[in-house]
């Protein structure tokens, strides 16, 4: 099963605009029906539809694998995220935790922006569109206290991240054209610089895309502005490994990790360390979806990079002296991410200029 038994030869090329739309929209349609069954408390139907959604999203990576080295990583991320959404809905269904809106002001704003949602019968549509589920309560995810951004601040952040992304992209392109192939023929500091640049490239791309969706979807009423938390927060103020992963990075996916990984592991073992390991393992699978469709196999770099984090958190708790230095965690994360993490994965699987490596 994914990702270890994926056969690169089992490609599913899709031709024709109608077939492409059918393959892309069918997993989304089954998830919407699953959400409908969730609000009707039909557990068996919800479980069956969850299985169908996961299988369809899983196969979509094989569909896109035939594209080769083209930039289709966003599709892998989208379907990996859809799998987590579907699994979370199924888990909540069996725990009888059907959510509801908990903010009267937000309820009225949603109904004003989405006039087709007039009563509770259409809650499943609103819940499916609210990807991060903020503004909902299901007695599982603790309230997340955050600063709600204004639309002006969203626009400013979008411009900053897009500009920084373009600058790093130009630098990366010049560096990749100047480097020798294979990469091992270059000095070690050039290799590290290129991998670290790759990590920044991915970081800025994700942030720019996130805020671009914000300035488009908020005016259209698809998502409420209160549902947009800060993406990775203010990393410069991060003081510990735990802060980086639990507050800055996983702020958008924490509701899914808690329901699918944290709570079941705590119930079975009672160990917070094992629960943390299960969350990072799930995160590694989710990130691996982005490049599995391109490479045709999983990357051990993701699993090493993420599964080492619980040990760093545990080490930090045992050695209080480490918490006094605010930037050591950022240095460690950058080195791990750049030398044997996202940078290596991007280097091997993403850019056509280095596809021969």
UniProtKB/Swiss-Prot annotation:
Keywords: Membrane, Mitochondrion, Transmembrane, Transmembrane helix. It is a multi-pass membrane protein. GO terms for biological process: lipid metabolic process. One of its GO terms (molecular function) is O-acyltransferase activity. Its main location: mitochondrion. The keyword Membrane applies. It is found in: Mitochondrion membrane. It comes from the Eukaryota. One of its GO terms (cellular component) is mitochondrion. InterPro entries: Wax_synthase_dom. Signal peptide: none annotated. The chain crosses the membrane at residues 13-33, 44-64, 72-92, 148-168, 181-201, 203-223, 266-286, 293-313, 327-347. This is Uncharacterized membrane protein C3H7.05c. It comes from Schizosaccharomyces pombe (strain 972 / ATCC 24843) (Fission yeast).
């Amino acid at each position: 099963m994914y990702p270890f038994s994926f056969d690169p030869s089992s490609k599913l090329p899709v031709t024709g605009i109608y077939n492409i739309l059918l393959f892309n929209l069918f997993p989304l349609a089954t998830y919407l029906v699953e959400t409908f069954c969730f609000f009707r408390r039909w557990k068996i139907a919800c479980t069956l539809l969850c299985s169908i959604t996961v299988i369809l999203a899983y196969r979509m990576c094989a569909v896109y694998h035939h594209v080769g080295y083209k930039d289709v990583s966003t599709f892998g991320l989208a379907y990996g995220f859809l799998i987590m959404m579907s699994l979370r809905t199924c888990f909540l269904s069996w725990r009888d935790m059907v959510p509801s809106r908990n903010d009267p002001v937000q309820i009225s704003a949603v109904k004003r922006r989405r006039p087709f949602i007039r009563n509770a019968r259409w809650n499943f549509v609103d819940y499916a569109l609210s990807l991060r589920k903020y503004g909902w309560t299901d007695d599982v995810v603790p309230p997340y206290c955050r600063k709600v951004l204004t639309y002006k601040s969203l626009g400013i952040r979008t411009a900053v991240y897009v500009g920084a992304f373009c600058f790093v992209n130009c630098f990366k392109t010049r560096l990749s054209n100047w480097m020798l192939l294979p990469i091992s023929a270059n000095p070690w500091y050039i290799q590290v610089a290129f991998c670290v640049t790759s990590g920044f490239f991915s970081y800025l791309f994700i942030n720019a895309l996130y805020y671009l969706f914000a300035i488009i979807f908020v005016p259209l009423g698809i998502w409420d502005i209160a549902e947009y938390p800060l993406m990775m927060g203010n990393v410069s103020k991060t003081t510990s490994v735990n802060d980086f992963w639990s507050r800055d990075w996983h702020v958008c996916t924490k509701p899914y990790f808690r329901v699918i990984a944290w709570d079941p592991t705590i119930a079975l073992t009672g160990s917070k360390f094992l629960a943390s390991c299960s969350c990072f393992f799930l995160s590694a699978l989710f990130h691996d979806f982005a490049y599995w469709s391109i490479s045709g196999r999983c990357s051990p770099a993701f699993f090493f990079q993420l599964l080492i984090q619980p040990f760093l958190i545990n080490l930090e708790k045992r050695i209080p002296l480490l918490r006094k230095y605010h930037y050591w965690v950022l240095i460690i994360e950058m080195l791990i991410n750049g030398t044997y993490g996202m940078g290596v994965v991007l280097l091997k699987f993403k850019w056509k200029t280095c596809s021969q490596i």
